[in-house]
Amino acid sequence: MADPITNPATPTAVFGKQAVTEALSDHAAILGLKDLIVDAKWDRKELTLTVAPETIVAAMQAAKSAGYNFFEDVTAVDWYPSEPRFQISYSLLSHSLKQRIRIVAHISGDSPSIDSVTSVWPASNFYEREIFDLFGVHFSGHPRLTRIMMPDNWEGHPLRKDYPVEGYR
């Protein structure tokens, strides 16, 4: 049987909750994350781990402790009108393990919020500000969550799918 993490039998292998621990058992670097993982997916030679939004800081700390020493970026996707509406994706790299992982959290609502990971990854500062500015996602505990691209008096968040094409008037 092919190892689903390092050599999946199919280009896209998706694991349900019950199979997550089993599928990750040979992937020692991320074992510290196994109790936080809601779902795992292997696609295009990259592992994507889904965690509950309230565990994002713990997941980032566990990944860092596991050897993922480089924060590449964090980005958002608005899946409007679906719920949960927003997907926040963190990309991490381990130079020693020569591996990348993506850690994803899904958040709902018109006033979405998730904890800031700046305490673990200071490099996330401007990325979180950009997501706040363009999507309206609030990062609790962020040291300076202010607009970074749009003028301070700008109304709304232009990358939300429900943002009017003509802008607010």
Locate predicted features.
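Terminal low-complexity/charged segments
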Residues: 1-169
